[in-house]
Amino acid sequence: MFEGVFPALITPFQRNHGKNLDLDGLRSNIAHLVAAGVHGVVPCGSTGESATLSFAEHEQVVEVTMDEAGGKVPVLAGTGSNNTSEALRFTRAAKDVGADGVLVISPYYNKPNRSGLIKHYTAIADLDIPVVVYNVPGRTGQNITPDIIAELAKHPNIVGVKEASGDLGQISTIIELTRDEDFAVISGDDNLTLPILSLGGKGVISVAANIYPRPLIEMYEAAQKGDYETAREIHFKYSPLFRAMFYESNPIPVKKAAEILGMAAGPLRLPLDEASEQTTERLKEVLSRYD
């Protein structure tokens, strides 16, 4: 179910005092992505500024995403927290509105031990909804090692991992250890998507696909056909864009790029701030290559 190109959706905000949700803008962005042919969407992830959404806003974003994309493409809702009871609450809410699955970041700051991690994910998976583990040690301060992923993959509801460690050796080991399970290893880094696909990965949860979905889709489709020459050409053409998405902390650059391209984006919520003037000019230069 969770294979292909899944944009990690930005959450548009209004440029008012409260920086309220721009739900019409969210709908417009989702409709554009679905029409472009994405294989699924991910609301309320890191790119969606989930850390600064209230519980009610989190519910609203998932509900609107389901209303706009549900039945057209799978919706994988971000429901992670460093508090297991809160992650369970987010997950129940996503399940109640019909999300196809949930993306659950590993608990950040707490640094749980092995048994704590396994119990955390097991409690969420026991809610009887497909769970994709999200490993991003650069944000959480802790790496989920391949042996832990392999153990989690034995749970029938833990169906994949979004791997954003940046370590191809580790990712290769995870694919090796989970080959006998119905388990998807998904890239969490646009620039590593092609190498991960070549190892047997199943797709990407993408930042860049918010603004340029078609190249990612075409690269994925070429790789699926074994046409790695075409896939490499696309990869190298868009690598500058992939790198540009991290000129500053995600999602600062992608929201600015979306704004430049006329999409709904709006401001960021503190502690994230607007892209610097230098970043904005660098983004404009990179985007101009793809006009």
UniProtKB/Swiss-Prot annotation:
Q: Does the keyword Lyase apply?
A: yes
GO MF, one annotated term = 4-hydroxy-tetrahydrodipicolinate synthase activity
User: Would I find Lyase among this entry's keywords?
Assistant: yes
Annotated localization? Cytoplasm
Q: Name one GO biological process term.
A: diaminopimelate biosynthetic process
Query: Per the annotation, which location comes first and is thus the protein's main one?
Result: cytoplasm
**Residue sites binding pyruvate per the record:** T47, I205
Identify the residue position(s) of the site Part of a proton relay during catalysis.
S46, Y109
Q: Which CDD domains match?
A: DHDPS
Q: In which pathway does it act?
A: Amino-acid biosynthesis; L-lysine biosynthesis via DAP pathway; (S)-tetrahydrodipicolinate from L-aspartate: step 3/4
> PROSITE patterns under this entry?
DHDPS_1, DHDPS_2
Q: Which Gene3D superfamilies match?
A: Aldolase class I
Q: Which reaction does it catalyse?
A: L-aspartate 4-semialdehyde + pyruvate = (2S,4S)-4-hydroxy-2,3,4,5-tetrahydrodipicolinate + H2O + H(+)
InterPro entries documented for this protein:
Aldolase_TIM, DapA, DapA-like, Schiff_base-form_aldolases_AS, Schiff_base-form_aldolases_CS
The UniProt keyword set, sorted, is: Amino-acid biosynthesis, Cytoplasm, Diaminopimelate biosynthesis, Lyase, Lysine biosynthesis, Schiff base
Q: What EC number(s) does the entry state? A: 4.3.3.7
Question: Superkingdom of this entry's organism?
Answer: Archaea
| GO CC annotation | cytoplasm
What is stated as this protein's family in its record? Belongs to the DapA family.
The UniProt subunit note reads as follows: Homotetramer; dimer of dimers.
Please give the function described in this protein's UniProt entry: Catalyzes the condensation of (S)-aspartate-beta-semialdehyde [(S)-ASA] and pyruvate to 4-hydroxy-tetrahydrodipicolinate (HTPA).
Give the NCBIfam families listed for this entry: dapA
Q: What is this protein called?
A: 4-hydroxy-tetrahydrodipicolinate synthase
Q: What is the species listed in this Swiss-Prot or TrEMBL entry?
A: Methanospirillum hungatei JF-1 (strain ATCC 27890 / DSM 864 / NBRC 100397 / JF-1)
Upper classification of the organism: Archaea, Methanobacteriati, Methanobacteriota, Stenosarchaea group, Methanomicrobia
